[in-house]
Every structure is written in C-alpha cells, then in structure tokens.
C-alpha cells in the first residue's frame, strides 16, 4: 500500500432503495474476493468523523448513473424585484423572503437549488443520498468582491454530509449566525465536489448553479 492510500479510508457506499450508508472495506478483502463488488466507493479523510466531501469516488462498471443539468434557483420571492438575487430566495424556508440574522442570499439560493435537485432526483427514483459528484458554480453578490463560499457551504450542509461517520448521529448545522440545529434533510452522503467562482451565471440574479451525478441503487436504472 502506498503512502497516499495509507492516509485514506476506502469507504464503500451501499446504496439501497431507501438511502445510503458507509461501511469500511479493506483492500485485502477486495483482493481476496470475500466482499461483493460495490457500486460506489468513496475515499474519505482518515480521522475525520464529519468530513464535508470525499477525496474521490470510484464508480463500478455496472453502475447506472443519472446526470442532472445545471440547476439554478427558482424565482420564488415575488416581493423582490424581478431578476434580483433576492427574487431567488427560497420562500419555502424563509417566509416572505425575509432572511434571519446572518443568512446570506447565496445561502438562501443554495437551499433553493438543492431542493430543486432533490425533486429532480426523486422524479427519477433517486435521492440526495445517491449523489456521488457535485459541481458548483458561484457568482459574487452585488457589492461584494468574492463569491460567498461560507454561505454556500452552510446551505450544502443542510442537505449533505450532516451525519457523524463514527457514531451515526445527526450533526447539527448552523443557518446564518443562528445556533446549530437539525439539518433540513439528514444525509450521510459525501460526494466528490468542486465549487468555483465564475464571472457570471446565465440568468440575471443567480448566484448559485449546481449539477450532480447520482448512482442508481443496485438493480435499478433509468425509468
């Protein structure tokens, strides 16, 4: 085993119809053929009970993969000017488009986007727990010099990577500057992910656009 492999844990994501879980899988077992092949194998950092993302994800040759298009937020906040970043605040979470203390527009748009992705996946017989890869594009809000990565990451933790891998307990997640609380959706999945700032996004007012890949549970495929 090389030094890099020694510093990582190979965790096989078992993807049943009802969700996903992580289990340890040693290379010795795999070489001996004592363990069945897995659809997805995530490489997670050693010593971290609650990592945000995987270091990498391996997809088995037999896996059926669903890829979403780039998804931005819906214009749900009719109280804000059309085409403004505030018009894309998720009113299902923030009544009237009013943001609590510390919640940023990027954070609110991120929640909006991840709800849409969840609905997209569920229409295909999938869920957020089946997501293996995520690509995130952020624009900076008007009057700021840099994309709001912290706000995006808070939104992300509301739907992903919010369980303790050692105990299985739900991890509490902050929203804005509020005290950490139960996430909007409990999900142990840690996809591989990139997040980067772009010069602009295709729709006026969008600060967040996301696309994901998800693997169908064993024995299932596109509808």
Predicted regions and their residues:
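Bacterial N-terminal signal peptides that target proteins for export
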Residues: 1-12
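N-terminal presequence-like segments and the immediate start of the first folded domain
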Residues: 10-112, 119-124, 129-132, 142-223
